[in-house]
A protein has these predicted regions:
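Interfacial segments at transmembrane-helix termini and the short loops linking adjacent helices
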Residues: 114, 178-207
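Membrane-interface junctions at transmembrane-helix termini in multi-pass inner-membrane proteins
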Residues: 1-17, 203-234, 274-276
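Interfacial transmembrane-helix starts/ends
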Residues: 84, 121, 153-168, 172-180, ...
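Hydrophobic alpha-helical transmembrane segments
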Residues: 15-66, 233-238, 252-273, 314-317
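Alpha-helical transmembrane segments of polytopic membrane transporters and translocases
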Residues: 89, 104-108, 116-134, 164-168, ...
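Interhelical loop/hinge segments that connect adjacent transmembrane helices in multipass membrane
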Residues: 39-45, 57-101, 144-157, 278-289, ...
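Membrane-proximal transmembrane or re-entrant/amphipathic helices at the cytosolic face
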Residues: 301-346
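Helix-loop junctions and terminal segments of transmembrane helices
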Residues: 123-163, 216-221
């Protein structure tokens, strides 16, 4: 799947993901009826099987790259030891990141109740609206940025433009979700009612992670994978301390606030360390001004019900974003209009 991403074969990537889900559903449903007392084992086996099918299909679709017979291209004969040394810190940081993402739920289990965990989980479900933007962007950005660095190592406008565009998109979606959070909750059903006050700070999770994908490029280009461990430990420590203090005081809202702040720290650490090895002027001053404004907006909507101030706060944040990112917003509008015009012509 990684090679598919590197080749920008988005249709093949989507087809493999869909095939993976279809195989999983087709196989798992009958097996669950047959082995009624072994549901966990069935799920593990079927998940492994569907991934193997996806892997085989991907290799077959790219048979020109995967050469198992005859002489292989000397350019593809890589020394695995440097690759292993580069990859190991990512494995460690992934383990720490898993703990980082679970701390809020663990804290709610320890300091709160199962009902609070349920409400918090429902809020996280609504946040999945970001998944479409986040996954689509992350799918293509890293291969594109690495390719651009390989071809034009001194051209940094590409990273600045990518950062500005995804900043505008993610903050716009996040602020809009905060404004209409009560409507989303009502539409989704009674079990989501308690999620309305938790949502505002949870938006910083996908916002900061996705934007940081554009600012962390320096660590990737310079192969400073060990710094990923430092970043993961720093963000995780902040989240542990934050949840330990705020969850006993505020419950679910405290967990959301702590998680949101820790993701801002996560973004900052990624950006600072990346700029240490490969400096890019991301105009962080205006970014943090916008972030502070959205923090204030999220705070109000966490502790107060929807009213005229919620709408006014949204308008202020949108105007502020337009003032600081006007060129990017205008470019985005022109780009969308060009897509619409091209579709009409077809």
């Amino acid at each position: 799947m990684l090679i598919v991403r590197l080749e920008y074969k988005t249709k093949l990537y989507s087809a493999l993901n869909i095939a993976n889900r279809i195989v999983y559903l087709v196989v798992v449903i009958p097996l669950l009826f047959i082995f009624k007392e072994s549901h966990f084992e069935v799920l593990i086996v079927v998940m492994t099987f569907s991934l193997l099918v996806c892997m085989v299909a991907g290799i077959y679709a790219q048979s020109d790259i995967w050469k198992f017979r005859g002489k292989s291209d000397s350019a593809n004969n890589l020394d695995m030891l440097p690759i292993f040394k580069y990859a190991m810190p990512y494995v460690i940081s992934l383990g720490i990141a898993t703990l980082f993402q679970a701390i809020d739920t663990i804290a709610l289990n320890y300091y709160g109740s199962y009902s609070q965990v349920g409400v918090y989980s429902s809020a996280m479900t609504i946040i999945q609206v970001f998944t479409i933007v986040q996954t689509s962007f992350n799918l293509l950005w890293q291969p594109m940025s690495v390719e651009h660095y390989t071809n034009n190592p001194n051209d940094k406008t590409f990273y600045q433009k990518g950062n500005s565009i995804i900043t505008v998109v993610m903050f716009f979606v996040g602020m809009t979700l905060i404004l209409f959070k009560d409507i989303f909750v009502v539409l989704l059903g009674e079990e989501y009612r308690g999620a309305a006050t938790i949502l505002p700070f949870l938006i910083f999770n996908p916002i900061m992670y996705t934007i940081s994908e554009t600012t962390v490029s320096g660590l990737i280009f310079m192969k400073k994978s060990k710094m990923q461990i430092v970043i993961a430990v720093g963000a995780c420590a902040v989240n542990i301390v934050g949840n330990s203090i705020l969850v006993p005081l505020l419950g679910c809202e405290g967990a959301a606030i702590s998680t949101g702040i820790s993701y801002i720290v996560f973004f900052s650490l990624r950006t600072v360390f990346s700029n240490k090895y490969f400096y890019v002027d991301y105009k962080l001053g205006k970014f943090y001004i916008l972030t502070l404004a959205v923090i204030c907006y999220a705070s109000y909507n966490t502790f107060f019900k929807f009213d005229i101030w919620s709408v006014l706060g949204y308008v202020i944040c949108i105007v502020l974003m337009y003032i600081m990112y006007s060129k990017t917003i205008i470019w985005c509008f022109k780009y969308l209009l060009s897509i619409i015009k091209n579709k009409k012509q077809l």
